[in-house]
């Protein structure tokens, strides 16, 4: 079941890729993908290229994929291990969701962080109390880690 569904999503992605994202399997392993996200132009991550790893569980799509950011990013909902705090990757997952929708959700999280459900409380606090400092730090991290 899982491999058929993953194959279908891959075909759909190749036919109609989401804006500013690309994804596909690593080598021959259909359960392990790598994706690339372009930093949204209306965010401090603009110009950055962010690598994402995707691991599909054997019971996909009934369980969410494990998705992690490989590129270091300064963000209240993404920690230094690349874990992403996004409801659809946890309790809000639904088999109707696709990798394409997940990637678009990560892009919108880059544009609109959720400081009320942070993975990194210090960054969330800065986002709420000193937006200019947050944006300049996020920009400098993007230049340092995502534009190499």
Curated annotation (Swiss-Prot):
<feature type="domain" description="UBC core">
    <location>
        <begin position="1"/>
        <end position="147"/>
    </location>
</feature>
<dbReference type="InterPro" id="IPR000608">
    <property type="entry name" value="UBQ-conjugat_E2_core"/>
</dbReference>
<keyword id="KW-0547">Nucleotide-binding</keyword>
<dbReference type="GO" id="GO:0005524">
    <property type="term" value="F:ATP binding"/>
</dbReference>
<dbReference type="GO" id="GO:0004842">
    <property type="term" value="F:ubiquitin-protein transferase activity"/>
</dbReference>
<keyword id="KW-0067">ATP-binding</keyword>
<dbReference type="GO" id="GO:0061631">
    <property type="term" value="F:ubiquitin conjugating enzyme activity"/>
</dbReference>
<dbReference type="InterPro" id="IPR023313">
    <property type="entry name" value="UBQ-conjugating_AS"/>
</dbReference>
<dbReference type="GO" id="GO:0000209">
    <property type="term" value="P:protein polyubiquitination"/>
</dbReference>
<dbReference type="GO" id="GO:0006511">
    <property type="term" value="P:ubiquitin-dependent protein catabolic process"/>
</dbReference>
<comment type="similarity">
    <text>Belongs to the ubiquitin-conjugating enzyme family.</text>
</comment>
<comment type="pathway">
    <text>Protein modification; protein ubiquitination.</text>
</comment>
<dbReference type="InterPro" id="IPR016135">
    <property type="entry name" value="UBQ-conjugating_enzyme/RWD"/>
</dbReference>
<keyword id="KW-0833">Ubl conjugation pathway</keyword>
<dbReference type="GO" id="GO:0005634">
    <property type="term" value="C:nucleus"/>
</dbReference>
<dbReference type="Pfam" id="PF00179">
    <property type="entry name" value="UQ_con"/>
</dbReference>
<protein>
    <recommendedName>
        <fullName>Ubiquitin-conjugating enzyme E2 5B</fullName>
        <ecNumber>2.3.2.23</ecNumber>
    </recommendedName>
</protein>
<dbReference type="GO" id="GO:0016567">
    <property type="term" value="P:protein ubiquitination"/>
</dbReference>
<keyword id="KW-0808">Transferase</keyword>
<feature type="active site" description="Glycyl thioester intermediate">
    <location>
        <position position="85"/>
    </location>
</feature>
<comment type="function">
    <text>E2 conjugating enzyme that associates with the E3 ubiquitin-protein ligase EL5 to mediate ubiquitination of target proteins.</text>
</comment>
């Amino acid at each position: 079941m899982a491999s058929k569904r993953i194959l279908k999503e891959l075909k759909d992605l190749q036919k109609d890729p989401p804006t500013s994202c690309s994804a596909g399997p690593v080598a021959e392993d259909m359960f392990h993908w790598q994706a690339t996200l372009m930093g949204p132009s209306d965010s401090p991550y603009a110009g950055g290229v962010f690598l994402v790893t995707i691991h599909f569980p054997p019971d996909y799509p009934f369980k969410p994929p494990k998705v992690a950011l490989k590129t270091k990013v300064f963000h209240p909902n993404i920690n230094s291990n690349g874990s992403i705090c996004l409801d659809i990757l946890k309790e809000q997952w639904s088999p109707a969701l696709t990798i394409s929708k997940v990637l678009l959700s990560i892009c919108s999280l880059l544009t609109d962080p959720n400081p009320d459900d942070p993975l990194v409380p210090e960054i969330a606090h800065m986002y709420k109390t000193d937006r200019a400092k947050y944006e300049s730090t996020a920009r400098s991290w993007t230049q340092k880690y995502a534009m190499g």
